[in-house]
């Protein structure tokens, strides 16, 4: 009983999964670099504000 085929199928499945995750991460949303930077900074400011509010919340 050899497991060669099972190993090969698992390898193919993993490669497909890896390529799909890369595709999802590197999506092009049509923004210029400056617009993307501005959008990201606004998101980070909102996250920081939310974190600060949570930190200052009385227990």
UniProtKB/Swiss-Prot annotation:
Region span, Disordered: 1-59
Cross-referenced Pfam families: SERF-like_N
Matching InterPro entries: SERF-like_N, SERF1/2-like
GO cellular component: cytosol; nucleus
Family, similarity comment: Belongs to the SERF family.
Function, as annotated: Positive regulator of amyloid protein aggregation and proteotoxicity. Induces conformational changes in amyloid proteins, such as HTT, driving them into compact formations preceding the formation of aggregates.
Record protein name field: Small EDRK-rich factor 2
Gene designation: SERF2
């Amino acid at each position: 009983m050899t497991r060669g085929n099972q190993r090969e199928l698992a390898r193919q499945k993993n490669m497909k999964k890896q390529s799909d995750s890369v595709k999802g991460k590197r999506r092009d949303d049509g923004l210029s670099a400056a617009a993307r930077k501005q959008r990201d900074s606004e998101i980070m400011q909102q996250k920081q504000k939310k974190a600060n509010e949570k930190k200052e919340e009385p227990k």
